[in-house]
Design a protein with these regions (language model features):
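Extended alpha-helical targeting/anchoring segments
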Residues: 1-178
Length: 179
């Protein structure tokens, strides 16, 4: 909090590493996750001595040819029990000053991340603060894109985006150094 009070950071995301040994096959957990929380981006990584399973509605980065994009997601609410309730929840979400401020911080981080690897003037916000509905939640989503410079490739773009702003806060350098 002292970095925020001092004006050095807008947001810092405290986190901790968590792991557990469980008496079930890791891939079974992944299959269960697919059933309980179907998401557009799911993964299972088996490194032999440990496994990682995850699900996200958010692609951190997409590179197709020289086109690069990121789709920040921030602002989340559980789905309602009807379409009418979903609409009310979406309206409330877009009216929530804190959620909108956090979302705009991530949009700005996305613009900054892409600006480090894209041709000057090519970075644009394609969509700003659209509401998307998923199986269990409603999110605020934006889209930022640009054209990669000739001297950089997909891995350079990925390095510019890591860590995701949802994990680091802003500015990223402060979040990485102090969390």
């Amino acid at each position: 909090m002292k970095y925020i009070y001092a004006g050095d950071a807008f947001q810092v995301v405290p986190s901790q590493r968590w792991s557990a040994e469980v008496p079930v096959e890791a891939f079974s957990i992944y299959r269960g996750l697919r059933t309980v929380n179907p998401s557009p981006y799911m993964y299972f990584l088996d490194f032999g001595d440990f496994q990682i399973a995850g699900a996200s509605p958010e692609p951190l980065l997409t590179v197709t040819g020289r086109h690069v994009s990121t789709r920040p997601i921030a602002g989340t609410r559980p789905r309602g029990s009807s379409l009418e309730e979903d609409r009310r929840i979406a309206d409330d979400l877009l009216a929530d000053e804190k959620e909108c401020a956090e979302h705009m911080m991530l949009v700005d981080l996305g613009r900054n991340d892409l600006g480090r690897v894209c041709a000057y003037g090519s970075v644009v916000v394609d969509e700003l603060m659209q509401v998307e509905t998923y199986s269990h939640v409603i999110h605020i989503v934006s889209s930022v894109s640009g054209t990669l410079r000739d001297d950089v490739g997909a891995m350079d773009a990925l390095r510019s985006a890591l860590p995701a702003g949802t994990l680091s806060g802003a500015p990223k350098e402060i979040g990485r150094a102090h969390v």
